[in-house]
Amino acid sequence: MAGMDSGNLKTARLWRDAALRARKLRSNLRQLTLTAAGACPGAGADALESPASPQLVLPANLGDIEALNLGNNGLEEVPEGLGSALGSLRVLVLRRNRFARLPPAVAELGHHLTELDVSHNRLTALGAEVVSALRELRKLNLSHNQLPALPAQLGALAHLEELDVSFNRLAHLPDSLSCLSRLRTLDVDHNQLTAFPRQLLQLVALEELDVSSNRLRGLPEDISALRALKILWLSGAELGTLPAGFCELASLESLMLDNNGLQALPAQFSCLQRLKMLNLSSNLFEEFPAALLPLAGLEELYLSRNQLTSVPSLISGLGRLLTLWLDNNRIRYLPDSIVELTGLEELVLQGNQIAVLPDHFGQLSRVGLWKIKDNPLIQPPYEVCMKGIPYIAAYQKELAHSQPAVQPRLKLLLMGHKAAGKTLLRHCLTEERVEGCPGGGDKEKCYPPSPPPVSKGIEVTSWTADASRGLRFIVYDLAGDESYEVIQPFFLSPGALYVLVVNLATYEPRHFPTTVGSFLHRVGARVPHAVVCIVGTHADLCGERELEEKCLDIHRQIALQEKHDAEGLSRLAKVVDEALARDFELRSASPHAAYYGVSDKNLRRRKAHFQYLLNHRLQILSPVLPVSCRDPRHLRRLRDKLLSVAEHREIFPNLHRVLPRSWQVLEELHFQPPQAQRLWLSWWDSARLGLQAGLTEDRLQSALSYLHESGKLLYFEDSPALKEHVFHNLTRLIDILNVFFQRDPSLLLHKLLLGTSGEGKAEGESSPPMARSTPSQELLRATQLHQYVEGFLLHGLLPAHVIRLLLKPHVQAQQDLQLLLELLEKMGLCYCLNKPKGKPLNGSTAWYKFPCYVQNEVPHAEAWINGTNLAGQSFVAEQLQIEYSFPFTFPLGLFARYSVQINSHVVHRSDGKFQIFAYRGKVPVVVSYRPARGVLQPDTLSIASHASLPNIWTAWQAITPLVEELNVLLQEWPGLHYTVHILCSKCLKRGSPNPHAFPGELLSQPRPEGVAEIICPKNGSERVNVALVYPPTPTVISPCSKKNVGEKHRNQ
């Protein structure tokens, strides 16, 4: 049915209910289902050609059978004696076979047959004699065939009540159709009609009509003759206007007018007082149709993807509204009266320009489906709105209790390669110092030239850029060393200003992809539409001409990269459009077709993503700003630029967000002595601070949740291990992360030796006096620690007690260490290697694995820790392999974090730098990452398993949770373009270097009914079992986002 794939409408239930009614009537009949001997199960019209048509023999004694199902048998003829043997038959199902015409034997059943289903065949004609004989027929399904016309004899079926001729090639309908006076349901969608068939105007009993996806371009004025019509589908009918007579269809209850060219509705539209469901999505409405406001009985209203700029206050008159979709318009504000729609259960507002939600929004407490992303929200803040209506209600309640407060504070991130000059630039900006002060300058802030400061990893500084306006920057200096790449994405967040620092003294055009291009791709993938300023440092080391040429080259190559990416995405979007223009049946007919077998719903999702990527390109400020830290004019110009951009309300609306004063006070109290020095606070400690801020316990939760979402502190209400603690000291946490990601063996060994010198003297511990160690003991201890450092840098392995030594003095008590390790595991940075799930370690040493440190490319058995070994993989019949491809950029640290995320799903694992061998139960799985090899071979990440064909469900069961975990992680990169494919099992078995790739969207679709095998396009003689392409049950393509720790402290 038209629109069934949209997933946005509940109207599918209308057709489902009709099917259930028919099934209920059939349930009292004596039924029989037959399968042809030797036939491939489900070898229907869409299946492969078989050498011989399967034969089906009727059993004896069929005289009492009233319902016979011969569907999914690949039949070209019905069995001999069908008509004479079935004297009582009332229902005959022949769907999904290979009939080119209605079998003559069907005519013999005409005097008692009431229901006939010949859908999904190859009918090009019906046969006048056969149709004439079906005089008792009440229900006829001819959908999904190749019929160019219908015979006139169809009009003689006086008892016909339901007729489905959708998905055919009908250019017109026979005049005799007007004689079907009892017809209640007619489906003609997806045909080739060029005008509304006037014959239908005579069908006074018609209640349900679908003429979607035909090029009608208009409706007749006298369509009002269809007075019994209750359900009308006109989706994608190329309608520009509705005639006044349309408004006389007074019985209409459900109306689908989506995907047309409507700009307005007739004033008389308000006469449709029985209307309960209306879909006007994907039209050209610039104003909310006033004619809808008097429709007091309306329950569902869809106005997605129009050009609306406002919603009228009189919408509150739609008091029975349960569903309201207004997404992807240009709405700037909502009327206060919208909160009176207290019965709303679905409210979709994403993709608009809404900055402020009305007061008392929490009254919409019944809303379950809530979408608000991609709006410039200020009040409530974006982080609050994304949590849902209860959190919005708590925010507004708190705002009413305490005076509002505005905090102009912007996150500024300095990015760039190692030695780009980020740290020196940060010092000069935040301390307002000038190195050397050539040509004058403020002597009080003038410092003699000094060696470039050495970065200590990721550093955070607060910078009051303009005290008079109270404007502050929180400056994050992101380390340029590759070892920090796994944690850098945690700090890339919406609402921040990105400064990409390039060393102009060493820059060469051929190095653009690594010094500039890759950083832009990275930020764009993580934070679509981010604001980026390019700053060139060491300008004093370049000649005037050289400086100009290098800045112009960076500017030119950025423009070329953006143009290349946008054109590539446009081409891909065009392929999706072309696929959507073809019928699903046509797409599914040939594996050679683009997006073979992909549903309209998945194609529309794909198209929407491409459109999102095209509409949310990076905002790159031009031109490149050359800076020398020795020139106060350069620094002043850079400061002025940053301030002018920061104060632009349309670019950074969050800078002006309004908070309850009590929430701001709670934040400030967390950072005052004595608690400011502690690594974490208990929930009760925070509750006591909340009372000082005027927050009762029931109001504290929302405040902590906001501070967590906005990156001020970490509070994991969804984690049993962490929910009783609040991590407020983010500076110390970053210092701890820096310890793990400085890959200097001498520095690590020095920290361990310092840690051992104070061992046994930690706070809260007591120990007897220790004798001074002998030189030989000191040497032995140093040797052991050196081995631990080597194991860490080569294999990413550290025992818990060594981690404690490494983190002194940051971690003192054992509880600090345990909480910190739980936190690192939640961030996806490490996992406990030998801890039984849900059980204590019974005194044995806990070992932790940091996958980003693994150096050996091929996994090896770690039997020296867990006593297991990975047996060699034996030959098996069939392979499953899901491959993710990343054409533009591969997310930083994704493989390492994914390695941690899957740990709870696998056992007996062995890790390499780019590969993981493991088991799901007794089923082997292999996760592999292959870095890009040039422009034409992108980065890929694959998940594979294998099993014999009868047991292939076990392989699907093994890899499906791993696929879903990867999908969850990729949700953190909304601007990332990637593709998913199922690799052909036959190609893999042959060892093909370039196996055929079936579309990954098939993973989220049910197996096609009646299809047993699929042709591999790489080799037309190869047939792939459908079980090797489609999972037993569809996977979750867009799983609900899990709480990610890394997401939270990146949002400050």
Curated annotation (Swiss-Prot):
Instruction: Name what induces it.
Output: Up-regulated during erythroid cells differentiation (at protein level). Up-regulated upon Toll-like receptor TLR2 stimulation. Up-regulated in macrophages upon M. tuberculosis infection. Up-regulated upon sepsis. Up-regulated by glucose.
UniProt PTM comment? Ubiquitinated. Ubiquitination by PJA2 does not lead MFHAS1 to proteasomal degradation but positively regulates its function in polarization of macrophages.
The LRR repeats extend over 64-85, 88-109, 112-133, 136-157, 159-180, 182-203, 205-226, 228-249, 251-272, 274-296, 297-318, 320-341, 343-364
Please report the stretch or stretches of sequence annotated as the Roc domain. 403-649
GO CC aspect terms: cytoplasm
Tell me the PROSITE patterns matching this sequence: LRR, ROC
Which biological processes are named by the entry's GO terms?
erythrocyte differentiation; inflammatory response; innate immune response; intracellular signal transduction; negative regulation of inflammatory response; negative regulation of protein localization to nucleus; negative regulation of toll-like receptor 2 signaling pathway; negative regulation of toll-like receptor 4 signaling pathway
Any Pfam family the entry gives: LRR_8
Q: Which superkingdom is the protein from?
A: Eukaryota
The UniProt function text for this chain reads:
Probable GTP-binding protein. Functions in innate immunity and more specifically the inflammatory response as a regulator of the Toll-like receptor TLR2 and TLR4 signaling pathways. Negatively regulates the part of the TLR4 signaling pathway that leads to the activation of the transcription factor AP-1. By retaining the phosphatase complex PP2A into the cytoplasm, prevents the dephosphorylation of the AP-1 subunit JUN which is required for proper activation of the transcription factor. Both inhibits and activates the TLR2-dependent signaling pathway.
Which PANTHER family is this protein grouped with? PTHR48051, RAS SUPPRESSOR PROTEIN 1 (PTHR48051:SF1)
- In its UniProt record, what illness is this protein linked to? A chromosomal aberration involving MFHAS1 may be a cause of B-cell lymphoma. Translocation t(8;14)(p23.1;q21) with a cryptic exon named '14q21 element'. The resulting fusion protein named 'chimeric MASL1' is tumorigenic in nude mice.
UniProt name for this protein: Malignant fibrous histiocytoma-amplified sequence 1
